[in-house]
Amino acid sequence: MYLPQEIIRKKRDNVELTADEINFFIQGIAKETMSEGQIAAFAMAIYFNDMTMDERVALTCAMRDSGMVIDWSHMNFDGPIVDKHSTGGVGDVTSLMLGPMVAACGGFVPMISGRGLGHTGGTLDKLESIPGYNITPTNDVFGQVTKDAGVAIIGQTGDLAPADKRVYATRDVTATVDNISLITASILSKKLAAGLGSLVMDVKVGSGAFMPTYEASEDLAKSIVAVANGAGTKTTALLTDMNQVLASTAGNALEVREAVQFLTGEYRNPRLFEVTMALCAEMLVNSGLASDIEQAREQLQAVLDNGKAATCFGKMVAGLGGPVDFMENYDNYLEKAEIAKPVFAETTGYAYAMDTRGLGMAVVGMGGGRRVASDSIDYAVGLSDMIRLGDEVNTDTALCVIHARSEAQWQEAANAVRANITIADEKPAPTPDVYRRIRAEDI
Protein backbone atom coordinates (compact mmCIF):
# COMPACT_ATOMS: atom_id res chain seq x y z
CA MET A 1 0.00 0.00 0.00
CA TYR A 2 1.35 3.39 -1.00
CA LEU A 3 0.29 6.95 -0.31
CA PRO A 4 -0.26 8.95 -3.52
CA GLN A 5 1.34 12.05 -2.03
CA GLU A 6 4.52 10.10 -1.18
CA ILE A 7 4.81 8.93 -4.80
CA ILE A 8 4.31 12.53 -5.97
CA ARG A 9 6.89 13.73 -3.40
CA LYS A 10 9.49 11.22 -4.66
CA LYS A 11 9.05 12.31 -8.26
CA ARG A 12 9.02 15.97 -7.21
CA ASP A 13 12.38 15.40 -5.50
CA ASN A 14 13.76 13.62 -8.59
CA VAL A 15 13.91 10.17 -7.00
CA GLU A 16 13.33 7.23 -9.35
CA LEU A 17 9.99 5.48 -8.84
CA THR A 18 9.63 1.70 -8.72
CA ALA A 19 7.37 -0.16 -11.15
CA ASP A 20 5.06 -1.03 -8.22
CA GLU A 21 4.71 2.63 -7.21
CA ILE A 22 3.91 3.68 -10.78
CA ASN A 23 1.44 0.82 -11.16
CA PHE A 24 -0.32 1.76 -7.90
CA PHE A 25 -0.69 5.37 -9.02
CA ILE A 26 -2.00 4.51 -12.50
CA GLN A 27 -4.46 1.91 -11.17
CA GLY A 28 -5.76 4.63 -8.84
CA ILE A 29 -6.29 6.90 -11.84
CA ALA A 30 -8.21 4.17 -13.69
CA LYS A 31 -10.35 3.42 -10.61
CA GLU A 32 -10.86 7.16 -10.07
CA THR A 33 -9.45 7.10 -6.53
CA MET A 34 -6.82 9.69 -7.56
CA SER A 35 -8.01 13.29 -7.67
CA GLU A 36 -7.39 15.56 -10.64
CA GLY A 37 -5.07 17.59 -8.42
CA GLN A 38 -2.96 14.52 -7.71
CA ILE A 39 -2.80 13.62 -11.40
CA ALA A 40 -1.78 17.20 -12.23
CA ALA A 41 0.95 17.23 -9.56
CA PHE A 42 2.26 13.86 -10.75
CA ALA A 43 2.33 15.05 -14.38
CA MET A 44 4.09 18.30 -13.44
CA ALA A 45 6.70 16.42 -11.37
CA ILE A 46 7.41 14.22 -14.41
CA TYR A 47 7.48 17.30 -16.65
CA PHE A 48 10.22 18.95 -14.57
CA ASN A 49 12.28 15.88 -13.61
CA ASP A 50 11.45 13.53 -16.48
CA MET A 51 11.66 9.74 -16.18
CA THR A 52 14.34 7.11 -16.65
CA MET A 53 13.77 4.55 -19.41
CA ASP A 54 12.76 1.95 -16.77
CA GLU A 55 10.17 4.38 -15.37
CA ARG A 56 8.84 5.06 -18.88
CA VAL A 57 8.43 1.32 -19.52
CA ALA A 58 6.64 0.89 -16.18
CA LEU A 59 4.35 3.88 -16.86
CA THR A 60 3.49 2.60 -20.34
CA CYS A 61 2.76 -0.95 -19.14
CA ALA A 62 0.65 0.32 -16.21
CA MET A 63 -1.41 2.53 -18.54
CA ARG A 64 -1.73 -0.29 -21.09
CA ASP A 65 -2.94 -2.65 -18.34
CA SER A 66 -5.37 -0.11 -16.83
CA GLY A 67 -8.11 -1.49 -19.08
CA MET A 68 -8.70 -4.32 -21.53
CA VAL A 69 -5.70 -5.70 -23.42
CA ILE A 70 -6.95 -7.44 -26.56
CA ASP A 71 -5.96 -11.10 -26.90
CA TRP A 72 -6.25 -12.31 -30.48
CA SER A 73 -5.28 -15.95 -29.81
CA HIS A 74 -8.89 -17.20 -30.18
CA MET A 75 -9.04 -15.77 -33.72
CA ASN A 76 -6.32 -18.14 -34.99
CA PHE A 77 -4.83 -15.58 -37.37
CA ASP A 78 -2.43 -17.36 -39.74
CA GLY A 79 0.03 -14.47 -39.82
CA PRO A 80 1.65 -11.83 -37.62
CA ILE A 81 -0.35 -9.01 -35.96
CA VAL A 82 1.24 -5.70 -36.95
CA ASP A 83 0.44 -2.00 -36.82
CA LYS A 84 1.74 1.49 -37.53
CA HIS A 85 1.27 4.74 -35.65
CA SER A 86 1.96 8.24 -36.93
CA THR A 87 2.51 11.38 -34.88
CA GLY A 88 0.26 13.09 -37.45
CA GLY A 89 0.53 15.67 -40.17
CA VAL A 90 -1.30 17.18 -43.13
CA GLY A 91 -2.26 14.96 -46.06
CA ASP A 92 -0.95 11.97 -44.08
CA VAL A 93 -3.25 9.35 -45.55
CA THR A 94 -0.70 6.50 -45.37
CA SER A 95 -2.80 4.29 -43.04
CA LEU A 96 -5.51 3.85 -45.69
CA MET A 97 -3.06 2.27 -48.15
CA LEU A 98 -0.62 0.76 -45.67
CA GLY A 99 -3.18 -1.40 -43.83
CA PRO A 100 -4.49 -3.13 -46.98
CA MET A 101 -0.99 -3.44 -48.51
CA VAL A 102 0.42 -5.21 -45.45
CA ALA A 103 -2.74 -7.34 -45.18
CA ALA A 104 -2.34 -8.42 -48.81
CA CYS A 105 1.21 -9.55 -47.95
CA GLY A 106 -0.02 -11.82 -45.14
CA GLY A 107 -0.11 -9.54 -42.10
CA PHE A 108 -3.10 -8.77 -39.88
CA VAL A 109 -3.59 -5.09 -39.08
CA PRO A 110 -6.11 -4.31 -36.29
CA MET A 111 -5.55 -0.55 -36.34
CA ILE A 112 -7.04 1.60 -33.59
CA SER A 113 -6.88 5.18 -34.87
CA GLY A 114 -7.71 8.67 -33.73
CA ARG A 115 -9.60 11.76 -34.83
CA GLY A 116 -8.01 14.95 -36.04
CA LEU A 117 -7.41 17.77 -33.59
CA GLY A 118 -5.53 20.96 -34.30
CA HIS A 119 -3.90 21.11 -37.73
CA THR A 120 -3.54 17.33 -38.21
CA GLY A 121 -6.08 15.22 -40.06
CA GLY A 122 -7.56 12.17 -38.33
CA THR A 123 -7.76 8.74 -39.97
CA LEU A 124 -11.22 8.17 -38.44
CA ASP A 125 -12.58 11.42 -39.90
CA LYS A 126 -11.33 10.36 -43.33
CA LEU A 127 -13.00 6.95 -43.07
CA GLU A 128 -16.26 8.45 -41.81
CA SER A 129 -16.54 10.31 -45.12
CA ILE A 130 -17.45 6.84 -46.51
CA PRO A 131 -21.25 6.40 -46.08
CA GLY A 132 -22.11 3.70 -43.54
CA TYR A 133 -18.54 3.06 -42.35
CA ASN A 134 -18.75 2.18 -38.63
CA ILE A 135 -15.72 3.20 -36.57
CA THR A 136 -17.14 1.71 -33.35
CA PRO A 137 -17.97 -1.94 -34.13
CA THR A 138 -18.24 -4.61 -31.43
CA ASN A 139 -15.02 -6.43 -30.56
CA ASP A 140 -16.37 -9.51 -32.35
CA VAL A 141 -16.93 -7.56 -35.58
CA PHE A 142 -13.51 -5.87 -35.23
CA GLY A 143 -11.86 -9.28 -34.95
CA GLN A 144 -13.87 -10.85 -37.76
CA VAL A 145 -13.21 -8.02 -40.24
CA THR A 146 -9.50 -8.13 -39.34
CA LYS A 147 -9.53 -11.88 -40.07
CA ASP A 148 -11.56 -11.64 -43.30
CA ALA A 149 -9.98 -8.52 -44.84
CA GLY A 150 -6.61 -8.65 -43.08
CA VAL A 151 -7.18 -5.09 -41.85
CA ALA A 152 -9.75 -3.15 -39.82
CA ILE A 153 -9.33 0.51 -38.93
CA ILE A 154 -11.57 1.62 -36.05
CA GLY A 155 -11.73 4.12 -33.18
CA GLN A 156 -10.54 3.75 -29.59
CA THR A 157 -13.08 2.23 -27.23
CA GLY A 158 -13.42 3.40 -23.63
CA ASP A 159 -12.09 0.12 -22.23
CA LEU A 160 -8.65 0.48 -23.87
CA ALA A 161 -6.11 2.32 -21.68
CA PRO A 162 -8.74 4.30 -19.70
CA ALA A 163 -6.04 5.77 -17.42
CA ASP A 164 -4.53 7.53 -20.44
CA LYS A 165 -7.82 9.31 -21.12
CA ARG A 166 -7.83 10.86 -17.61
CA VAL A 167 -4.12 11.66 -17.64
CA TYR A 168 -4.34 13.29 -21.06
CA ALA A 169 -7.36 15.41 -20.13
CA THR A 170 -5.41 16.73 -17.13
CA ARG A 171 -2.20 17.29 -19.11
CA ASP A 172 -4.17 19.26 -21.67
CA VAL A 173 -5.24 21.87 -19.10
CA THR A 174 -2.05 21.97 -16.99
CA ALA A 175 0.63 22.71 -19.65
CA THR A 176 2.19 19.24 -19.37
CA VAL A 177 1.45 17.94 -22.87
CA ASP A 178 4.93 18.38 -24.35
CA ASN A 179 6.98 15.95 -22.28
CA ILE A 180 8.52 12.98 -24.08
CA SER A 181 8.00 10.49 -21.21
CA LEU A 182 4.28 11.34 -21.01
CA ILE A 183 3.86 11.44 -24.80
CA THR A 184 5.56 8.03 -25.14
CA ALA A 185 3.32 6.40 -22.54
CA SER A 186 0.18 7.98 -23.99
CA ILE A 187 0.89 6.79 -27.54
CA LEU A 188 2.10 3.32 -26.63
CA SER A 189 -0.43 2.44 -23.92
CA LYS A 190 -3.24 2.64 -26.48
CA LYS A 191 -1.30 0.90 -29.26
CA LEU A 192 0.06 -1.94 -27.12
CA ALA A 193 -3.40 -2.62 -25.65
CA ALA A 194 -4.37 -3.78 -29.16
CA GLY A 195 -2.36 -6.99 -28.72
CA LEU A 196 0.29 -6.33 -31.37
CA GLY A 197 3.24 -8.53 -32.30
CA SER A 198 5.17 -5.61 -33.77
CA LEU A 199 4.79 -1.87 -34.37
CA VAL A 200 6.29 0.73 -36.70
CA MET A 201 6.25 4.39 -35.62
CA ASP A 202 6.11 7.17 -38.19
CA VAL A 203 7.52 10.23 -36.43
CA LYS A 204 7.09 13.39 -38.49
CA VAL A 205 9.72 16.10 -38.88
CA GLY A 206 9.22 19.67 -40.11
CA SER A 207 6.74 22.54 -40.27
CA GLY A 208 3.66 20.31 -40.01
CA ALA A 209 5.05 17.95 -37.35
CA PHE A 210 3.85 17.47 -33.78
CA MET A 211 7.36 17.95 -32.37
CA PRO A 212 8.92 21.40 -32.96
CA THR A 213 12.43 20.39 -34.12
CA TYR A 214 14.25 17.51 -35.83
CA GLU A 215 16.07 16.80 -32.55
CA ALA A 216 12.81 16.62 -30.58
CA SER A 217 11.29 14.28 -33.18
CA GLU A 218 14.39 12.07 -33.01
CA ASP A 219 14.26 12.00 -29.18
CA LEU A 220 10.59 10.98 -29.28
CA ALA A 221 11.28 8.24 -31.84
CA LYS A 222 14.14 6.85 -29.73
CA SER A 223 11.99 6.93 -26.59
CA ILE A 224 9.11 5.10 -28.28
CA VAL A 225 11.40 2.42 -29.76
CA ALA A 226 13.18 1.84 -26.43
CA VAL A 227 10.00 1.77 -24.34
CA ALA A 228 7.92 -0.39 -26.72
CA ASN A 229 10.70 -2.96 -27.00
CA GLY A 230 11.11 -2.78 -23.21
CA ALA A 231 7.39 -3.52 -22.90
CA GLY A 232 7.80 -6.61 -25.10
CA THR A 233 6.62 -5.38 -28.52
CA LYS A 234 9.17 -5.31 -31.34
CA THR A 235 9.16 -1.72 -32.59
CA THR A 236 11.13 0.43 -35.01
CA ALA A 237 10.60 4.04 -36.10
CA LEU A 238 11.05 6.07 -39.26
CA LEU A 239 11.59 9.83 -39.21
CA THR A 240 9.65 11.16 -42.22
CA ASP A 241 9.27 14.61 -43.74
CA MET A 242 6.33 16.92 -43.00
CA ASN A 243 7.78 20.17 -44.38
CA GLN A 244 5.07 20.01 -47.04
CA VAL A 245 1.67 18.34 -47.41
CA LEU A 246 2.42 14.62 -47.81
CA ALA A 247 -0.31 13.65 -50.28
CA SER A 248 -1.66 15.70 -53.20
CA THR A 249 -4.73 16.41 -51.06
CA ALA A 250 -5.67 17.65 -47.58
CA GLY A 251 -9.27 17.10 -46.53
CA ASN A 252 -11.26 14.02 -45.60
CA ALA A 253 -13.18 12.81 -48.68
CA LEU A 254 -10.41 14.17 -50.93
CA GLU A 255 -7.80 12.06 -49.16
CA VAL A 256 -9.99 8.92 -49.29
CA ARG A 257 -10.37 9.49 -53.03
CA GLU A 258 -6.58 9.74 -53.34
CA ALA A 259 -6.10 6.56 -51.25
CA VAL A 260 -8.43 4.58 -53.54
CA GLN A 261 -6.65 5.93 -56.64
CA PHE A 262 -3.32 4.95 -55.06
CA LEU A 263 -4.49 1.38 -54.38
CA THR A 264 -6.00 0.92 -57.85
CA GLY A 265 -3.00 2.49 -59.60
CA GLU A 266 -5.00 5.35 -61.07
CA TYR A 267 -2.65 7.91 -59.46
CA ARG A 268 0.23 7.65 -56.97
CA ASN A 269 1.84 10.78 -55.59
CA PRO A 270 5.62 10.05 -55.56
CA ARG A 271 6.29 11.30 -52.00
CA LEU A 272 3.24 9.55 -50.60
CA PHE A 273 4.31 6.38 -52.42
CA GLU A 274 7.85 6.52 -51.00
CA VAL A 275 6.77 7.10 -47.38
CA THR A 276 4.01 4.45 -47.56
CA MET A 277 6.36 1.88 -49.12
CA ALA A 278 9.06 2.60 -46.52
CA LEU A 279 6.63 2.13 -43.61
CA CYS A 280 5.07 -1.01 -45.11
CA ALA A 281 8.47 -2.55 -45.85
CA GLU A 282 9.55 -1.90 -42.26
CA MET A 283 6.37 -3.66 -41.03
CA LEU A 284 7.00 -6.71 -43.23
CA VAL A 285 10.62 -7.05 -42.09
CA ASN A 286 9.76 -6.46 -38.40
CA SER A 287 7.11 -9.16 -38.46
CA GLY A 288 9.12 -11.72 -40.44
CA LEU A 289 6.95 -11.50 -43.58
CA ALA A 290 10.04 -10.43 -45.56
CA SER A 291 13.72 -11.11 -44.97
CA ASP A 292 14.91 -7.63 -45.97
CA ILE A 293 13.66 -4.26 -47.22
CA GLU A 294 14.30 -5.10 -50.88
CA GLN A 295 12.22 -8.29 -50.73
CA ALA A 296 9.51 -6.44 -48.82
CA ARG A 297 9.26 -3.72 -51.47
CA GLU A 298 8.94 -6.36 -54.21
CA GLN A 299 6.07 -8.04 -52.33
CA LEU A 300 4.35 -4.70 -51.76
CA GLN A 301 4.66 -3.67 -55.41
CA ALA A 302 3.19 -7.03 -56.41
CA VAL A 303 0.04 -6.63 -54.25
CA LEU A 304 -0.48 -3.15 -55.68
CA ASP A 305 -0.04 -4.41 -59.24
CA ASN A 306 -2.26 -7.50 -58.91
CA GLY A 307 -5.07 -5.66 -57.10
CA LYS A 308 -4.88 -7.65 -53.84
CA ALA A 309 -4.28 -4.54 -51.72
CA ALA A 310 -7.28 -2.76 -53.27
CA THR A 311 -9.42 -5.87 -52.62
CA CYS A 312 -8.44 -5.86 -48.93
CA PHE A 313 -9.49 -2.20 -48.60
CA GLY A 314 -12.83 -2.93 -50.29
CA LYS A 315 -13.45 -5.89 -47.95
CA MET A 316 -12.68 -3.75 -44.90
CA VAL A 317 -15.09 -1.01 -46.01
CA ALA A 318 -17.89 -3.51 -46.71
CA GLY A 319 -17.22 -5.45 -43.49
CA LEU A 320 -17.53 -2.27 -41.40
CA GLY A 321 -20.82 -1.18 -42.96
CA GLY A 322 -19.71 0.78 -46.03
CA PRO A 323 -20.83 0.20 -49.63
CA VAL A 324 -19.90 -3.22 -51.09
CA ASP A 325 -19.08 -1.56 -54.44
CA PHE A 326 -17.07 1.30 -52.93
CA MET A 327 -13.85 0.59 -54.85
CA GLU A 328 -15.68 0.59 -58.18
CA ASN A 329 -17.94 3.57 -57.49
CA TYR A 330 -16.08 5.60 -54.85
CA ASP A 331 -16.64 8.85 -56.72
CA ASN A 332 -20.42 8.46 -56.38
CA TYR A 333 -20.21 7.88 -52.63
CA LEU A 334 -17.74 10.57 -51.55
CA GLU A 335 -19.23 14.01 -50.96
CA LYS A 336 -18.08 16.88 -53.19
CA ALA A 337 -17.99 20.60 -52.43
CA GLU A 338 -19.95 23.02 -54.64
CA ILE A 339 -16.84 24.98 -55.66
CA ALA A 340 -13.55 23.48 -56.84
CA LYS A 341 -11.23 26.01 -58.42
CA PRO A 342 -7.51 26.77 -58.33
CA VAL A 343 -5.71 29.50 -56.42
CA PHE A 344 -2.86 30.99 -58.44
CA ALA A 345 0.52 32.30 -57.38
CA GLU A 346 0.91 36.09 -57.32
CA THR A 347 4.60 36.11 -58.22
CA THR A 348 7.22 34.11 -60.14
CA GLY A 349 10.01 31.90 -58.80
CA TYR A 350 10.03 28.56 -57.01
CA ALA A 351 7.86 27.03 -54.30
CA TYR A 352 10.46 27.50 -51.58
CA ALA A 353 8.76 26.64 -48.28
CA MET A 354 5.40 25.64 -46.82
CA ASP A 355 4.00 26.30 -43.39
CA THR A 356 2.34 22.90 -43.38
CA ARG A 357 0.67 23.57 -40.04
CA GLY A 358 -0.84 26.76 -41.52
CA LEU A 359 -2.19 24.84 -44.52
CA GLY A 360 -3.71 22.26 -42.17
CA MET A 361 -5.37 25.07 -40.22
CA ALA A 362 -6.74 26.47 -43.51
CA VAL A 363 -8.57 23.14 -44.00
CA VAL A 364 -9.79 23.29 -40.38
CA GLY A 365 -11.01 26.85 -41.01
CA MET A 366 -13.18 25.56 -43.87
CA GLY A 367 -14.78 22.99 -41.54
CA GLY A 368 -12.58 20.07 -42.60
CA GLY A 369 -11.16 19.64 -39.09
CA ARG A 370 -11.89 20.43 -35.45
CA ARG A 371 -10.92 23.39 -33.32
CA VAL A 372 -12.48 21.69 -30.30
CA ALA A 373 -13.34 18.00 -29.92
CA SER A 374 -17.11 18.62 -30.15
CA ASP A 375 -16.95 20.29 -33.61
CA SER A 376 -18.62 18.49 -36.53
CA ILE A 377 -16.70 17.86 -39.75
CA ASP A 378 -17.44 18.86 -43.34
CA TYR A 379 -16.01 15.91 -45.28
CA ALA A 380 -16.11 17.54 -48.72
CA VAL A 381 -13.92 20.61 -48.21
CA GLY A 382 -10.14 20.82 -48.53
CA LEU A 383 -7.22 21.23 -50.90
CA SER A 384 -6.15 19.09 -53.85
CA ASP A 385 -3.47 19.16 -56.57
CA MET A 386 -0.98 20.62 -54.08
CA ILE A 387 2.15 22.20 -55.50
CA ARG A 388 5.45 20.57 -54.45
CA LEU A 389 8.44 22.35 -52.98
CA GLY A 390 10.94 23.09 -55.75
CA ASP A 391 8.27 23.46 -58.46
CA GLU A 392 8.69 26.46 -60.75
CA VAL A 393 5.95 29.05 -60.30
CA ASN A 394 4.50 31.95 -62.28
CA THR A 395 1.21 33.83 -62.11
CA ASP A 396 -0.45 31.09 -64.20
CA THR A 397 0.63 28.36 -61.76
CA ALA A 398 -2.01 26.86 -59.49
CA LEU A 399 -0.74 26.47 -55.93
CA CYS A 400 -3.60 24.03 -55.34
CA VAL A 401 -7.31 23.55 -56.04
CA ILE A 402 -9.58 24.67 -53.20
CA HIS A 403 -12.79 22.71 -52.59
CA ALA A 404 -15.19 25.06 -50.81
CA ARG A 405 -18.87 25.49 -50.00
CA SER A 406 -19.05 29.18 -50.95
CA GLU A 407 -17.10 31.92 -52.72
CA ALA A 408 -16.40 33.59 -49.37
CA GLN A 409 -15.01 30.35 -47.94
CA TRP A 410 -12.92 29.83 -51.09
CA GLN A 411 -11.49 33.36 -50.81
CA GLU A 412 -10.57 32.95 -47.16
CA ALA A 413 -8.83 29.65 -47.93
CA ALA A 414 -7.06 31.19 -50.95
CA ASN A 415 -5.63 33.93 -48.72
CA ALA A 416 -4.44 31.29 -46.25
CA VAL A 417 -2.84 29.16 -48.98
CA ARG A 418 -0.93 32.13 -50.41
CA ALA A 419 0.18 33.18 -46.92
CA ASN A 420 1.52 29.72 -46.08
CA ILE A 421 3.45 28.98 -49.29
CA THR A 422 6.67 30.97 -49.76
CA ILE A 423 7.74 31.75 -53.34
CA ALA A 424 11.43 32.65 -53.74
CA ASP A 425 13.91 33.28 -56.56
CA GLU A 426 16.02 30.29 -55.61
CA LYS A 427 15.12 26.61 -55.55
CA PRO A 428 15.06 25.08 -52.05
CA ALA A 429 17.52 22.34 -51.14
CA PRO A 430 15.69 19.01 -51.49
CA THR A 431 14.71 17.22 -48.27
CA PRO A 432 14.53 13.43 -48.00
CA ASP A 433 11.11 11.76 -47.71
CA VAL A 434 12.55 9.45 -45.04
CA TYR A 435 15.36 10.88 -42.87
CA ARG A 436 16.37 7.79 -40.95
CA ARG A 437 15.32 4.49 -39.39
CA ILE A 438 15.65 3.96 -35.64
CA ARG A 439 15.87 0.42 -34.25
CA ALA A 440 16.46 -0.79 -30.70
CA GLU A 441 20.11 -1.48 -31.47
CA ASP A 442 20.60 2.16 -32.61
CA ILE A 443 19.79 3.61 -29.18
UniProtKB/Swiss-Prot annotation:
Reaction equations catalysed: thymidine + phosphate = 2-deoxy-alpha-D-ribose 1-phosphate + thymine
Q: Name one GO molecular function term.
A: 1,4-alpha-oligoglucan phosphorylase activity
Name one matching Pfam family: Glycos_trans_3N
Per the record, the pathway is: Pyrimidine metabolism; dTMP biosynthesis via salvage pathway; dTMP from thymine: step 1/2
Q: Which residues cross the membrane?
A: none
What EC designation does it have? Answer: 2.4.2.4
Q: Does the keyword Transferase apply?
A: yes
Describe its function: The enzymes which catalyze the reversible phosphorolysis of pyrimidine nucleosides are involved in the degradation of these compounds and in their utilization as carbon and energy sources, or in the rescue of pyrimidine bases for nucleotide synthesis.
- Which NCBIfam families does the protein's record reference? PRK05820.1, T_phosphoryl, Y_phosphoryl
Q: Which family does it belong to?
A: Belongs to the thymidine/pyrimidine-nucleoside phosphorylase family.
Q: What is this protein called?
A: Thymidine phosphorylase
Which species does this protein come from?
A: Photobacterium profundum (strain SS9)
What is this organism's lineage? Bacteria, Pseudomonadati, Pseudomonadota, Gammaproteobacteria, Vibrionales
